[in-house]
Amino acid sequence: MRATVRVTALVSALLLFAISFSQSSYASDTRSSHGDHASRFSTIFKSPTHKPKPLAATVSPTSGCVKTNATPHNPIKVGNPDQGNAILDRVFTLNSNCGPIIFKAFGKKAVFTVIAMSFLAKSGYFDHSLCHRVTTAGIFVLQCGDPTASGSGGPPFTYRDENLPGNAPNNYPAGTIAMANSGPGTNGSQFFIVYKDSHLPPSYTIWGLVTQGLDIVKRVAAAGIVGGGNDGTPKMTIAIESVSVD
């Protein structure tokens, strides 16, 4: 009888501990979504669950662009962005083999995104990487930022969505720079450039606007897709050779 009572008491104690631990974890997660940017920085950048998968490909020059030696490759190793970086509007220049694409980044509206993308750019993460996807019907975007060119590559951290638009017609107008993701809070390095007004689910962080070079993206889209169709690898090879941030 005494043994039964002791076992029952032990089980009750374990259940109370489990409930207490679960509530404590939830409270910690909730707190991480409040407060100033610096205090949240250590929790906002989380390790992704996917692993980059290199993709073999043959790259050839196309009229209008110079030859590139960029090929799919494993991303360089990077740490986490520096929380001390100033949160300011910045100008990114994508130096591509087809010419420069310049855009203003919205550092005040998309704080974590601009800090993260500036960090990756300055680390050389995007250097010699291929823009791996273009769409030509329904939505009109060129997708870049994945060194593996597989659509699954990314840095060793993710961060939350910011500056999302409403669900209005053409909520992603031409010239928009937005983050690609695989669900809420999974932003990494992949981004897309909208070359024609498009309507998408309001789930993709808008963090910049093209000021020069949108004609290059339109030219890449007009060249079509490898194997045909309206969504796939650009027939006109375009690579980001380097990125400068001012």
PLM feature spans:
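Bacterial N-terminal signal peptides that target proteins for export
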Residues: 1-10
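Cyclophilin-like peptidyl-prolyl cis-trans isomerases
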Residues: 6-7, 17-246
